[in-house]
Amino acid sequence: MKANDIKKGNVVEYNNGVYQIRDIERSSPQGRGGNVRFRFIMYSVPGGNKLDASFDADDNLVEVELLRRQSTYSYKDGDAFVFLDDEDYTPYTLDADVIGDDAGYITDGLTGIYVQVIDEQPVAIQLPASVVLEVIETPPELKGGTATKRPKPAKLNTGIEIMVPEYIVNGERVLVNTATGEFAGRAD
């Protein structure tokens, strides 16, 4: 698979190890003939050791076959998150450092999560495209400010903060895009 086809969450072989891509930076320098370069932040699977590597768009990486098991978030065990397989109720336990920033989107009973499994070991999760979270703290709407679309900060029930439109109030349930971390509309 070419470097320019790789997406966040893919698992690849590199330097005799297996790594999951967590972040991708694309740069197109003006010199050097304008070759597009990709910088991947990867974590070893299993182990979670961070690796930073750069590739040209045409560089080939071998994608690793992994199982994707649809699961539901069950509970937190210390720093670990426990997910139950939707079909056979197999528990998958992943440490908080493996979950990373995705922890801010995980609520009790969240469904539609895919646990990625290699050699019967859970290595990562893939969240649904959007999740419903509750606004617990946001400033009130400014009266007379309806002509402008000013976003305002809102703290959500999982502890993350996003920008929301002015008409959103405390206690309201909102959709949040898990890929961008942005407000995606009202829930319900």
Curated annotation (Swiss-Prot):
Gene3D superfamilies noted in UniProt: 2.30.30.30, Nucleic acid-binding proteins (2.40.50.140)
Listed GO CC annotations: cytoplasm
Family annotation (InterPro entries): Elong-fact-P_C, NA-bd_OB-fold, Rib_uL2_dom2, Transl_elong_fac_P/YeiP, Transl_elong_KOW-like, Transl_elong_p-like_YeiP, Transl_elong_P/YeiP_cen, Transl_elong_P/YeiP_CS
Any one GO MF annotation of this record: translation elongation factor activity
Entry's Gene Ontology BP terms: peptide biosynthetic process
UniProt xrefs under Pfam families: EFP, EFP_N, Elong-fact-P_C
UniProt-listed SMART domains: EFP, Elong-fact-P_C
Family: Belongs to the elongation factor P family.
Name of protein: Elongation factor P-like protein
